[in-house]
């Protein structure tokens, strides 16, 4: 695997950004700029990554491309298309978003209707529109696996890949996001095996974090830093590396640079 972090770390220039990641022993990065930052800035960060020997794991969208308001929805679809084109130009492993929802105030929130046939059809059309307009050749567009919206399981991911029917659509695997039951939690080693067995050949990037069962009733899971939970991280890394020796694995959702550095050191000690 190639280890990276979602933090861009505090930096004053593209060169400092790249060197800080390299100094931590990282091999890949999340791209910290995008289509709204201008071509010169994008090129400068890409060159800095190349000079430091860092691959680019992902370009993020993180906008509601299924927003209820039609104008807002189209605005974010257009943004996603431009982000895919940036990812393609710089050779990122993927451009990634979550599917989004029109059914509530939180754009990435959990609602019953997220699992409706209406949402499914909207999502397939949206993904195809982004891919068919951007027409990437050197990257994949991905929808990250999630706990309360599609895709929320390996089987659902496979159905989505089949429904979208585009070779430019890939899997962005976040295993922790899909650990939503006692069985998946306590037997996460088996769930990891299931994910990589079923999604083999489609996975282009992974998120890396941990998960812990809280002692209070009823069933409550808490995302946490690597090593602070019960996920079989060593197995996760082994499976990802078997899928692709250069598989990006991105540590995410920590607060400070110091927390990211601590998590990096833990993962490096594991593998």
Q: Which residues make up each language-model segment?
A:
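Acidic-and-aromatic substrate-binding clefts and catalytic sites of carbohydrate-active enzymes
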Residues: 7-15, 31-44, 64-74, 103, ...
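Short, electropositive alpha-helical surface patch
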Residues: 111-119, 150-165, 221-236, 259-271
């Amino acid at each position: 695997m190639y280890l990276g972090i979602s933090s861009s770390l505090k930096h004053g220039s593209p060169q400092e950004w790249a060197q800080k990641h390299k100094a931590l022993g990282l091999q890949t990065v999340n791209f910290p700029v995008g289509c709204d930052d201008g071509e010169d800035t994008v090129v400068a960060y890409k060159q800095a990554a190349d000079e430091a020997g860092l691959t680019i794991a992902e370009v993020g969208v993180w906008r509601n491309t299924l927003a209820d308001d039609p104008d807002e929805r189209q605005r974010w679809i257009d943004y996603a298309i431009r982000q895919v084109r940036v990812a393609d130009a710089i050779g990122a492993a993927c451009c990634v978003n979550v599917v989004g929802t029109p059914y509530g105030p939180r754009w990435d929130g959990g609602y019953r209707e997220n699992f409706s046939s209406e949402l499914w059809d909207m999502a397939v059309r949206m993904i195809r529109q982004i891919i068919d307009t951007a027409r990437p050749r050197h990257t994949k567009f991905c929808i990250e696996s999630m706990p309360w919206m599609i895709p929320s399981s390996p089987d659902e991911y496979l159905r989505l890949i089949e429904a979208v029917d585009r070779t430019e659509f890939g899997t962005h695997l976040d295993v922790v996001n899909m650990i939503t039951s006692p069985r998946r939690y306590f037997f996460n080693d088996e769930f990891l095996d299931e994910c990589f067995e079923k999604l083999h050949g489609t996975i282009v990037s992974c998120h890396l974090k941990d998960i812990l069962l809280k002692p209070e009733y009823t069933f409550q899971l808490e995302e946490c830093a690597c090593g602070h939970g019960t996920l079989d991280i060593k197995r996760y890394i082994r499976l990802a590396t078997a899928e692709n020796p250069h598989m990006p694995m991105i540590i995410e959702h920590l607060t400070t640079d110091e927390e990211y550095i601590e998590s990096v050191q833990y993962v490096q000690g594991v593998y």
